[in-house]
Amino acid sequence: DIVKTAQVARVSFYRNFNSISDVVDYITDELANEFIDKILPVLNSNDENKWREFLFDFINNALNNRGKIEAINLQNTAVLFSHLNTKMQMYVNVNSNKTISDKYTSYVKACLINNVVKKWIDDGMVETPEEIINYLMSFITLF
C-alpha cells in the first residue's frame, strides 16, 4: 500500500528497493533535501517577502506531496520531520563562539516550520495555507 500511495511504480519498487523501509527512506531523503535546498537561502534573512515566498512554496510542496507524506504517516512514523531535523543539524552551524542568537535562531526557525507543518498535516490540513503562513510569520518575524 505504501508503494502505491507514495506513487512509486511497482516495477521501480522491485528494481530499486529492498524493502518498504527503503521506500520510506528514499521519500524522506528526497523531501528533506528539497526543504534544505530551499530554506538555506532565507534562513538568516529578515526579509518578510522572502520568508513568505519560501513558506508558500514549502506548504504547496507539502500539498503536492500529500500522498507521499500520508504514506509515511500511515506507517505511524514521524520519519520525515525527524529526518529534516537531522539534516538541519548538518547544515546549520552551531558554533560555541557565537552569541546564543547566532547559534540557535536559524535552527529554531527551521524546527518551528517543520513542527507546525507536521501538526497541520497530521490534523488533516484544515487551515488554509495562508492561515498557516501568517501563523508561522508571527513567530519568524520575532527573530
Where are the model-predicted features located?
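Helix-turn-helix
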Residues: 1-22
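DNA-binding alpha-helical recognition surfaces that contact promoter or target DNA
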Residues: 15, 25-26, 134
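Regular secondary-structure segments
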Residues: 32, 36, 40, 63, ...
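A short secondary-structure junction motif
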Residues: 34-38, 65, 87-95, 143
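Amphipathic alpha-helical packing segments from all-alpha helical-bundle domains
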Residues: 53, 74-111, 130
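Hydrophobic alpha-helical segments that form the core
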Residues: 100-123, 127-142
